[in-house]
Amino acid sequence: MKTTISYKTTNILIEKLKKQENIEVISNKGFFKKLFNNKKYADVYFHSGSLDEKSIKNIKNSKITIVNSFSIKNKILEELKISSERIEVIYPSININIENEDTIKIDFYKKFNIDFDTKLIFFTAKNFKTSGIKEFLDICSNLNYSNFKIIIAGDKRQIGSLQFSLPKYKKLEEKIILIDDYKNFDELFLVSDIFLLPTHNKSFATNILKAMFCKCVVFLSIKNDAKEVIDVFASMSSPTDVTIAFKIDAILLDEKELENIKEQNNKLAKECSIENNLKRFNEEISNI
């Protein structure tokens, strides 16, 4: 017997599940289903986004609802007063191939004429403004450590708009590397040392897990649900947290601690690999 699933928006885990023989996706988009209100509810509902009327019906009628953070789980429990056992948290899945890591780094440093002992601080996001690009540049401007470069990557539109703001950051003029529409964004995580995301957004920033998986030290505003996977040292009290520049200086000056945190982050992020998340999901549905 197949387990049925439904979702608002797809993700890596859902796309993998679609290929399993024991999984069937329920769709209620057909004309006649809407006309006769012949709606089916899935065994498992993947919730994302706002808790609207449609989502509430799916949650109440499913056997299990999957969310990507405890913050969302707690909000659902508070508003709907349903059993905690019916809401399961599976953090976003990571599916990155880190083979040839050294070659990728060497090629990148050569391409952009970077000394091999230079540290790289990375920023990327779908929406630069709400993800804290201004705060990112302000923090980097306040660093005392000097031997670093900044990678800022996005689409052509975002990079083009950003260039109008850069003249005010004279101190960073020789340090900024702008990259638009890079062929493989995952490689930018692999070559970087620090991923700094002073975001204003609440929705789980999957890039934090990607960065951790790729052995970056991460810093993140606690406004974001991804705060659940980082420790106190990596947490920013707000996107404008003035202590972060001191923390970055300290970690860049301590090579041993830098490497230690990178390895710890990689170990933690591996728990969210697509293989581990598939295993966890299949264990959950075996109890339905």
Language model features with spans:
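Glycosyltransferase donor-sugar binding loop
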Residues: 124, 149-162
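Nucleotide-activated donor-binding/catalytic signature segment of Leloir-type glycosyltransferases, i.e.
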Residues: 163-181
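Conserved donor-binding/catalytic core segment of Leloir-type glycosyltransferases
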Residues: 115-131, 140
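A charged, aromatic-enriched C-terminal amphipathic alpha-helix characteristic of glycosyltransferases
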Residues: 8, 253-287
